[in-house]
Amino acid sequence: MSDAGTEEFDEEQGSLGEYEGDRNEAGERHGQGKAVLPRGDTYQGAYENGKRCGQGTYKFKNGARYTGEWYMNLKHGQGVLYYPDGSKYEGSWVDDQRQGHGVYTYPNGDTYDGEWLHHQRHGQGTYTHQETGSQYRGTWVVGNMESTGELIQLNHRYHGNFVNNNPSGPGKYVFDIGCEQHGEYFQLEPDKGEAEEDETLISTTLKWKPKAVTGLSV
């Protein structure tokens, strides 16, 4: 569920390169134009007073491509960024960062549809695993599943609290056969495994303690 492969790519800011297009009275790039930058990146779209501003497409030499809105040379507004690893982000940008609502499609086909802040999953969102169809719907904090959420699996779903991507505390399993199992997740004492010198290997184990089975709540 990591954002591996989502590193942003620096657009060339200081080097003007070659330009063909409209200019204003001051000689600045203004209107529609195309630029070929020294290291091989290209931009085609709108300029305002020498800055990328409005709709445009920026193609990176490494194969990444952004098509969407710009403001003061930064990705800002609605746009799509295609990454070299095959992943894609489509949604809102603020000051060159994924922020607001957007959909990220990962190289393995997994998707995250929800809120972002400073490039990270943050707020309400749904992560869907392409291979199994399982989903997490709920709250995210700085990229992790936190607070109230629902983990949906084949034939059942779990609703409860999450801490650092794991269920924690009271919750319930809801089964398609028409019943609910209420209980609590707690963390067992960590086991210290073998380690070299002063390193310590700690494995975290979660245990579900069932308390009651009821019919489906309305």
Swiss-Prot record:
Main location per the UniProt record: cytoplasm
Subcellular location: Cytoplasm, Cytoskeleton, Cilium axoneme; Cytoplasm, Cytoskeleton, Flagellum basal body; Cytoplasm, Cytoskeleton, Flagellum axoneme
Biased composition (Acidic residues): 1-13
Gene Ontology cellular-component terms listed: 9+2 motile cilium; nucleus; radial spoke head; sperm flagellum
Tissue-level expression: Testis-specific.
MORN repeats: 19-42, 43-65, 66-88, 89-111, 112-134, 158-180
Name of the protein in its database record: Radial spoke head 1 homolog
Organism: Cyprinus carpio
Lineage: Eukaryota, Metazoa, Chordata, Craniata, Vertebrata
